[in-house]
Amino acid sequence: MHQGTCHCGAVKLTLPSKPEVATACNCSLCRRIGGPWVYFEFGTVQIEGHPENTLEYIQGDKTLRTVRCRTCGCVTHWEPLEPKPGAKHGVHLGNFDPELIASVIVRKFDGANSWKFFDELPSTNESPPQGEA
């Protein structure tokens, strides 16, 4: 198991397995938060210190809450407001050891416009779009 924490240690995350692939998204929220996300089946990530040490942000279509530590402010994860079968937890990989981060392949995702991975889009010489999705 792989464990990580927010900066102050008030929120601890334990992953059920080593992630192989992470996603770097350019949507209006993720590009501000920065860092890659890894995904696991909802309920399989152990989270200590939540909700007592966290604050949440709910925006847009009001289906997800983005969670951060109330002390140090580090974003730790997101979770569905109403988990359904097949729901996922998004975990911010920046809260884990650099060795784990370096071992994970990061795919860039166009959450601002096409809702596809950039490596699946037609090749162009233009810079990736930076919309306000």
Regions found by a protein language model. Give the residues of each.
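A short Gly-Trp-Pro
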Residues: 1-5, 10-133
